[in-house]
């Protein structure tokens, strides 16, 4: 059996080669780890279905892994303010993007209007009723139960809903019958389960559900424009810029349109 000294003499000439190989392996491992580190996207609940599909496609095309946190824009903005590690924020209104911009929590130069949406009145499937979107129509008298909306105090869909109800003169009669939800998808679920007799959600949410029927579309003049801005957060990882570019690209446009979104001008 060879002694330790003999073994050292044999390895000696190869010591430099082995060291270089080890260093290269460590660099490669570090590079792979950095490349695979996920991008964290905070996005409005109404974008859930499309962004999950686009995230998977982005990864299959060689992009960094993407993980999502979907909730109301207000909740997400406050979480970012409190230090939550988000790389990209997609809001369902300009107010909450402005909120972060005023606090220097997004990279203003990357901010862009990504999408637009439409507000609709829905009911559980099989329980629809006639609705006319004009002043003088008695919407409060057209149904007896609860009206599901995003919380008008902070949820964008609820804020738009309140504006639309005020526009037509229905707010005072209906505000005591509201079921206020934490986000627009939660409001939709209340209608799907029959816990609310009607709801105000985005057209894209209604399209994603087989359990509700659209009764009418609120005209755009009845509320502020429904615009979805997106921006990189302060300190975002480099891969996040590529994902922002991807979701706003022509390659992603068909997925948005298929879900009922309108591309921002």
Task: Describe the function of each predicted region.
Residues 2-18:
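Bacterial N-terminal signal peptides that target proteins for export
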Residues 8-12, 26, 190:
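Compositionally biased, low-complexity repeat tracts
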Residues 16-28:
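Bacterial N-terminal signal peptides
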């Amino acid at each position: 059996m060879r002694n330790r000294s003999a073994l050292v003499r044999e390895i000696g000439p190869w010591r430099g080669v082995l060291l270089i190989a080890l260093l290269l392996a460590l660099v490669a491992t570090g590079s792979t780890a950095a490349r695979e580190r996920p991008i964290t996207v905070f996005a409005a609940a109404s974008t859930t279905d499309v962004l999950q599909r686009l995230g998977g496609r982005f990864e299959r095309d060689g992009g960094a892994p993407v993980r999502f946190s979907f909730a109301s824009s207000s909740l997400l903005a406050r979480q970012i303010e409190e230090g939550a590690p988000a790389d990209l924020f997609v809001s369902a209104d300009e107010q909450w993007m402005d909120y972060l911009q005023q606090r220097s929590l997004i990279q203003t130069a990357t901010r862009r209007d990504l999408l637009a949406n439409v507000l609709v009145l829905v009911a559980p499937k099989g329980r629809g009723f006639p609705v006319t979107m004009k002043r003088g129509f008695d919407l409060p008298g057209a149904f007896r139960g609860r009206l599901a909306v995003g919380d008008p105090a902070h949820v964008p869909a609820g804020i738009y809903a309140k504006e639309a109800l005020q526009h037509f003169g229905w707010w005072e009669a209906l505000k005591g019958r509201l079921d206020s939800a934490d986000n627009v998808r939660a409001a939709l679920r209340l209608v799907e389960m029959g816990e609310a007799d009607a709801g105000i959600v985005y057209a894209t949410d209604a399209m994603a559900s087989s359990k509700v029927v659209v009764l009418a579309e609120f005209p755009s003049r009845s509320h502020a424009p429904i615009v979805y801005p997106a921006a990189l957060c302060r300190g975002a990882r480099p891969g996040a810029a590529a994902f922002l570019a991807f979701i706003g690209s022509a390659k992603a446009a068909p997925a948005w349109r298929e879900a009922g979104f309108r591309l921002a001008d």
